[in-house]
């Protein structure tokens, strides 16, 4: 019996390690980076991250093979879903101006292992995104020279007939990644200046495309004789919108750069809103122009926009578009290489990844080791994988990060901020609830006197409510919710919300096509999932939120992040099975890294004092007055069978 209790105690403590949250410093503006980026810098960085290969390559691929002219609708859906996610990023970026983006946001609200998995997937997202851009850059340059580069490579380097790999090695794409890596290592100020130059050229070319495109537009290209507006139907539109997410993944570079922003509280939300609005408008208008210029089924997926002008007899315009596309893709590549090492740095700085990647160059003030190593890995990916495989793999990691950031917004909105010096949840003795206190005469134990003083004030003065407590207006109807600690019901409700959203989207996606459910069971499952989803929203909504702050706050919480979670999960399920398989393999690799290194070297793990389990606790004897008798006592121990077992039993008794 004692052995079983010891083992269960060890397991409980280990699970507690996995879900610990990050302790924020009191001074969030303190950083080893150089805070030099303005709102304009961040906005152009975001535009550069979004408007690139997605505009010049992805539009042609999706229009021809997935959605047809209805790619316009696909971009609208993807833009709305991205807007919901972007607003979540904006709130976090303003409140937590630390590098790390989705990884950091998850760490301070959900827990360590989830943050590591999100960070691990964001690393993959940026590596694949940069490799895909380099592949697209190479393809566009090759099209200018009539595919002579490709033909030369196939003749002299040979071709590959290996599943999941490209048909031939792309040395040009690999080389451009290495060159961009060298530029990024010069520092944030130089990278920002270089991005300004390429972004200005790109935006000028986009204006040229829109003006010339509408002049050359042929409305009959959307007619039934050419296949109609939506030749692939609703399914094609939704599948296209899932892939279109690739076009918008660049906005999180703004949140990643928050530790280098001069005034992150204002600059981050403004830059995200402006850049996403401009990028969405550009994608919708350009995809409209493209499918109106030439029939969608005749598009060249590798260089759709330039080829469209060639086919209309404006070869000079095609050269301008090709040159502009190369500049635009340079901005995306720089954006990915700018963000990737900063995510790696954030994880290494927290102890979850190898410490060597936390080194910052004293002169350039950038994580140069992370830049060089992961820039090289990105160049290898661009060398051996083709664009289509890279793009599909990219979307799933992005959508998962968006989902966890949305959930993190809800959790953080309904809990007290945790700063350095405060106890982390789960490290203290459980505090009895008010109802438990009223219904028992047993003394109640706490690990600090301040814990009890805080709770006594809340028990005696119901008007003093903290985030996560039941609103006073709902106490007559939902009084049983007062039995739980502040934020506990919200945390459980967020889990229920995510599970019910996953069930609902799974039924909508697979219920008729894959599972072939009868109508009655299909309807019943949708109804039950919808009720669970709505019920969890209601339970969250009846609790107190944080008071309004001076920083940007997402409107309509929890509804807005809940919609973001639903849309993200729906789009994830529209991706192919092979994408999920590759994603699962990457997750397994990440778990191996975490359990072999991260969980033991985490700085939050080092914060746990070895003497924590033997400090004095306080016993509080209930009384009818505000002042209660408080007496310090020594830690409890149970009868021991050896010194080690006695110590472990004492720790288990406290927990």
Where are these regions (language model features)?
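TM-loop-TM module centered on a large, flexible mid-protein loop between adjacent transmembrane helices
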Residues: 104-105, 111, 142-154, 229, ...
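Helix-loop-helix junctions that connect adjacent transmembrane segments
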Residues: 28-34, 72, 148-174, 196-322, ...
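Extracellular loop-to-transmembrane helix junctions
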Residues: 34, 55-161, 275-278, 586
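Membrane-helix boundary/coupling elements in multi-pass transport proteins
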Residues: 59, 98, 121-139, 243-261, ...
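C-terminal membrane-solvent junction of multi-pass transporters and transport-like membrane proteins
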Residues: 165-169, 231, 357-366, 405-576, ...
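Membrane-interface loop-to-helix entry segments
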Residues: 138, 168-219, 231-234, 272-276, ...
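Membrane-interface "cap" regions at the ends of multi-pass membrane proteins
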Residues: 1-60, 64-72, 76, 82-87, ...
């Amino acid at each position: 019996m004692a052995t079983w209790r010891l083992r269960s105690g060890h397991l409980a403590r280990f699970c507690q390690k996995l879900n610990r949250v990050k302790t924020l410093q009191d001074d969030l503006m303190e950083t080893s980076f150089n805070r030099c980026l303005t709102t304009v810098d961040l906005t152009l960085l975001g535009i550069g991250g979004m408007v690139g290969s997605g505009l010049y390559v992805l539009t042609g691929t999706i229009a021809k093979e997935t959605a047809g002219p209805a790619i316009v609708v696909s971009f609208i859906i993807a833009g709305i879903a991205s807007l919901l996610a972007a607003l979540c990023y904006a709130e976090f970026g303003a409140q937590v101006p630390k590098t790390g983006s989705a990884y950091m946001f998850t760490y301070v609200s959900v827990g360590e292992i989830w943050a590591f998995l999100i960070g691990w997937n964001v690393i993959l997202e940026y590596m694949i995104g940069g490799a895909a851009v380099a592949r697209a850059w190479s393809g566009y340059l090759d099209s200018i020279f009539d595919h002579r580069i490709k033909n030369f490579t196939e003749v002299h380097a040979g071709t590959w007939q290996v599943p999941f790999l490209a048909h031939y090695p792309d040395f040009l794409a690999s080389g451009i990644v290495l060159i961009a890596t060298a530029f990024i290592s010069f520092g944030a100020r130089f990278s920002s200046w270089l991005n300004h130059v390429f972004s200005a050229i790109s935006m000028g070319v986009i204006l040229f495309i829109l003006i010339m495109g509408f002049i050359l537009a042929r409305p009959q290209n959307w007619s039934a004789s050419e296949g109609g507006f939506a030749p692939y139907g609703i399914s094609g539109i939704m599948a296209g919108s899932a892939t279109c997410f690739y076009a918008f993944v660049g906005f999180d570079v703004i949140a990643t750069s928050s530790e280098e922003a001069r005034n992150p509280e204002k600059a981050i939300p403004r830059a995200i809103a402006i850049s996403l609005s401009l990028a969405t408008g550009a994608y919708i208008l350009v995809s409209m122009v493209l499918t109106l210029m030439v029939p969608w089924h005749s598009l060249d997926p590798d260089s759709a926009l330039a080829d469209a002008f060639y086919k209309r007899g404006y070869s000079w315009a095609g050269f301008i578009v090709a040159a502009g596309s190369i500049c635009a893709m340079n901005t995306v590549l720089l954006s990915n290489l700018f963000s990737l090492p900063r995510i790696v740095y954030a994880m290494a700085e927290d102890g979850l990844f190898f410490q060597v990647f936390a080194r910052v160059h004293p002169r350039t003030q950038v994580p140069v080791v992370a830049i060089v190593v992961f820039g090289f890995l990105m160049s290898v990916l661009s060398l051996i994988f083709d664009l289509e495989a890279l793009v599909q793999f990219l979307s799933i990691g992005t959508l998962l990060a968006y989902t966890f950031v949305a959930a993190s917004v809800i959790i953080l909105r309904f809990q007290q901020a945790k700063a350095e010096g405060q106890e982390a949840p789960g490290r203290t003795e459980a505090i009895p609830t008010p109802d438990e206190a009223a219904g028992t005469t047993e003394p109640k134990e706490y690990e600090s006197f301040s814990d009890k003083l805080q709770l006594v004030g809340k028990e005696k003065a119901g008007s003093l409510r903290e985030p996560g407590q039941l609103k006073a207006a709902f106490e007559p109807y939902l009084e049983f919710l007062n039995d739980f600690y502040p934020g506990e019901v919200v945390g459980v409700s967020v889990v229920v919300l995510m599970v019910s959203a996953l069930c609902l989207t799974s039924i909508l996606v697979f219920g008729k096509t894959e599972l072939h459910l009868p109508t009655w069971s299909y309807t019943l499952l949708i109804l039950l999932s919808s009720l669970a989803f709505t019920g969890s929203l209601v339970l969250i909504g009846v609790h107190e939120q944080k008071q309004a702050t001076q920083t940007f706050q997402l409107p309509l919480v929890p509804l807005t992040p809940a919609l973001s979670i639903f849309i993200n999960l729906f789009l994830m399920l529209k991706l192919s099975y092979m994408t999920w398989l590759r994603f699962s393999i990457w997750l397994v690799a990440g778990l191996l890294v975490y359990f072999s290194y991260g969980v033991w070297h985490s700085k939050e793990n080092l914060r746990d004092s070895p003497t924590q389990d033997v400090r004095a606790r306080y016993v509080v004897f209930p009384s009818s007055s505000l002042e209660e008798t408080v007496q310090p006592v020594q830690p409890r121990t149970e009868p021991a069978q050896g010194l080690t077992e006695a110590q472990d039993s004492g720790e288990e008794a406290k927990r």
